[in-house]
Amino acid sequence: MSAEGYQYRALYDYKKEREEDIDLHLGDILTVNKGSLVALGFSDGQEARPEDIGWLNGYNETTGERGDFPGTYVEYIGRKRISPPTPKPRPPRPLPVAPGSSKTEADTEQQALPLPDLAEQFAPPDVAPPLLIKLLEAIEKKGLECSTLYRTQSSSNPAELRQLLDCDAASVDLEMIDVHVLADAFKRYLADLPNPVIPVAVYNEMMSLAQELQSPEDCIQLLKKLIRLPNIPHQCWLTLQYLLKHFFKLSQASSKNLLNARVLSEIFSPVLFRFPAASSDNTEHLIKAIEILISTEWNERQPAPALPPKPPKPTTVANNSMNNNMSLQDAEWYWGDISREEVNEKLRDTADGTFLVRDASTKMHGDYTLTLRKGGNNKLIKIFHRDGKYGFSDPLTFNSVVELINHYRNESLAQYNPKLDVKLLYPVSKYQQDQVVKEDNIEAVGKKLHEYNTQFQEKSREYDRLYEEYTRTSQEIQMKRTAIEAFNETIKIFEEQCQTQERYSKEYIEKFKREGNEKEIQRIMHNHDKLKSRISEIIDSRRRLEEDLKKQAAEYREIDKRMNSIKPDLIQLRKTRDQYLMWLTQKGVRQKKLNEWLGNENTEDQYSLVEDDEDLPHHDEKTWNVGSSNRNKAENLLRGKRDGTFLVRESSKQGCYACSVVVDGEVKHCVINKTATGYGFAEPYNLYSSLKELVLHYQHTSLVQHNDSLNVTLAYPVYAQQRR
């Protein structure tokens, strides 16, 4: 269900004056429901003139706040369909390469390649990524009048500096670092972004504007309009504006640093655009476009207009119809004992205010963790329990977790932490997770299982192929970096030899001239030319290798992008396949039939049939249910047993059970939840009507879907194995 609405962009900063207002930051995107304007008596067409409307009530998509804002502070963008907030598909995300023990330059090159996209590095009210701000402030402080800035390459490795800043940017003292190293790190930062600051989608229009318009004033206005929202992403626009301010400041000191707008545009257009296989004409037009933008003053802002008169609003009494007496187990937002990784997956790319509650990782009875989406990141808040009361911090005042959560669904968490100015708006419901299976008969579900499993296998093969290529390319890059270092050392040795030869040759040439020995003179000159020629050959070889390395590094980044674009699909396909498989298992479908749909007739894997269900010792609960045993006794019983040997015991957590199983020669423990929907290791898998039903399912299904370190099935009941 969606409604019609309008979008506006903030032109000025506004600090709220009343409780019902919301803050505005330059560039914020706001949405207003059409119905709210109709209710105020405004007709179609007037939405495009917000300054005539006065105060509008809407939703700030950038900050996640809803309230009133002045129409004189915004501009109209266009119409938009407004839908209730739903989780978005997971976009590709670059993953950092695991650091190795060796700190060679090749390793540094590899580790410094991945960078998060701009949208993941910062969010308004920040005007640019913190790392970028720190670099440019240091460059402007140390090198504003430097005559070689951005044109002299430093001897240090900028990747090492960027990696250091990435880890702990606040603690690094840039005063001690040479300005050319900082400049190289800045250029490297722009080059390593997964996507260019200026998106490819606007290249053609920028070139046309730079080529066709004769008046610089007209061109500036149209270019400014082109590079604003919604043509480019919000973070890209803010970052580009920050860069242009930096370039403008440098160009104002061009009499000393020799960096006018033209020179700066030539230096930075390749990393701002990354236009592949561009003709020289296209490149020239893009350089001209950047030159025009740099020449424009970006620091000055027009003063904000006067606020429109604001009518008094009637006060409303908040109606809290939420049930504080509800059991925690029945709350849709309570997920029990799930891992932090699963929580991150469920909250990925959701709106600010999305939340869920799980058991605290400390496993202390009564302690829980609230995970809340704020500013595009997950915020973890501990819920403490003491003397029958709950809360985030002392004094604990709430009678239950449900009462605590319901309170903050109406009130901002700024009461607890000023930086968390958001309400608990959108619960992640555990009851909506099982609606994946839409078909209503077993045969239709089986066909869909076969379809999803086939897609999963194809994606897996594609990912494996890319991973092999990724690994091979990484190794080749390291080898080429090592070879370039060897070339550098060789060139250094030859140049020293050449200098030595020149120094001594002068004396001998003078001597042989006096003696009239032309033959010896020719021999000395020939040897010198031969040495020079050899140096040139080595330098050419190094240059070709550097070009190959540059191309291969681009390929490496492209492979990494493709892998990250496939990974979300792979994860989603696996989850969907497993949900279909679980649905069929719950309906009592035999393993033989499942294997046919999965294509496992002749292949043994986690879904293969080991032995007929009727013959399994698992049917006798006495072989694995040891009652009220503790962790130490369980470990003693399982010590020395083969992988897959297990038992089930009562847990120290009231109302739950624990499964102890041997994995890779070690005994591991995991909680079995008992909920209103059934037994299970985690939501949404708490579906089994009895412990026996759960044990029979995981006899042929690996626990790895719940925990990466538990790649094992419940194969051998502890007492059944002893009786054998």
Swiss-Prot record:
Cellular component aspect of the GO annotation: cell-cell junction; cis-Golgi network; cytoplasm; cytosol; membrane; nucleus; perinuclear endoplasmic reticulum membrane; perinuclear region of cytoplasm
Q: How is it modified after translation?
A: Polyubiquitinated in T-cells by CBLB; which does not promote proteasomal degradation but impairs association with CD28 and CD3Z upon T-cell activation.
Which keywords label this protein? Acetylation, GTPase activation, Phosphoprotein, Protein transport, Repeat, SH2 domain, SH3 domain, Stress response, Transport, Ubl conjugation
Q: Which domain of life is it from?
A: Eukaryota
Residues with N-acetylserine modification: 2
Region (Disordered) residue spans: 80-109
Gene deleted: what happens?
Double knockouts for KBTBD2 and PIK3R1 have increased body weight, normal fat storage, blood glucose and insulin levels.
Q: Which residues form the SH2 domain?
A: 333-428, 624-718
| Domain spans labelled Rho-GAP | 113-301
Q: Which CDD domains does the UniProt record give? A: iSH2_PIK3R1, RhoGAP_p85, SH2_cSH2_p85_like, SH2_nSH2_p85_like, SH3_PI3K_p85alpha
Give any single GO term for biological process: positive regulation of focal adhesion disassembly
Which SMART domains does the protein's record reference? RhoGAP, SH2, SH3
Modified positions (Phosphoserine) in chain numbering = 154, 279, 608
Which residues in this protein are found as Phosphotyrosine? 467, 580
| Pfam families, A to Z | PI3K_P85_iSH2, RhoGAP, SH2
Mind telling me what this protein is named?
Answer: Phosphatidylinositol 3-kinase regulatory subunit alpha
